[in-house]
Amino acid sequence: MHPSRDIVLLITHSGDFYTVDRVAQALSRHGAKPFRLNTDMFPTSVELATHLSKSGNRHWLKHDEEYLNVEQVRAVWMRRIWQPQLATNLAPQYRSACIRESVTTLDGFWDSLREARWVDSLQRINIAENKLRQLRVAQEIGLSIPRTLVTNDPSEAREFFLGLKGKVVVKLLTPLSYSMKGSSFFMYTSKVKEEDLLDAKTLSYCPMIFQEQIPKQRELRIVFVDGNFFVGALNASQYAASTTDWRCTDDKNLGWEAFQLPEQLASRINLFMKKFGL
């Protein structure tokens, strides 16, 4: 007799609050059983085992005294994955090896869940996370993008800056931190100043993405779920004078409002997501 497949696995981390909790509550109301897996707690606080043999394969994990058999999992929400939280006194050579082995073990565990419905599959997410691929696909389907330069050449960056009369912002291609609040070394989207490019030798160690600065009226955050849009909007005039990135504002009154996307824009974003299979 097989266990009932009524569990929805929520893949996240211990610093994730509110959103994942709301999703868990909604799942419970609809009769499903949410199982939260904080990936950063593996391997120190999460136990996992995979048994492979001629008689069959078994995969299970235990987290916060809750036991999960993969046969119980009906669907997976891949929200966030964090690296393991390991002891600070662990020798660097062992630390890197432990992280690598732990991440690889979790990758194998995800494979055991391939029969479940994923939102979204890790392979598709990894393909879609490439910013240059995002920009190329956006162009192909008719979305407007800002003029963009990715380089580790200081002279190219200076020429780009001058060509746009200083209206340039800079960001990384990948996040240094995966939390909304970032960390002590988090880098926000920032406006480029001329003095930043006087001595840009450090660019040779780390290529960055430079983009034309577009004056903002609203900042939109769009959640897309199977053709449905859930859009939050910020009034950019509340923070544009003090910061380029809304996450840096000190305005405690900054609030999100519901927003309706223009039909043509919604259609193109829908096509954009289909291109990535999301």
Task: Tell where the protein language model's regions lie, with residue ranges.
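Conserved N-proximal alpha/beta basic substrate-recognition cap immediately N-terminal to
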Residues: 3, 14-30, 35-144
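Extreme N-terminal starter segment of soluble prokaryotic enzymes
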Residues: 4-9
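Phosphate-binding site of ATP-dependent enzymes
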Residues: 27, 157-158, 163-267, 272
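General beta-strand structural signal in soluble alpha/beta enzymes
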Residues: 36-37, 118-120, 147-151, 170, ...
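Short, basic, helix/turn surface patches
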Residues: 59-70, 149-150, 169-182
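Short acidic/polar capping segments at secondary-structure boundaries
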Residues: 83, 123-126, 150-156, 174-176, ...
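Rossmann-like NAD(P)H-binding beta-loop-alpha module
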Residues: 141-165
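Short, intrinsically disordered, charge-balanced linker/junction segments flanking boundaries
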Residues: 273-278
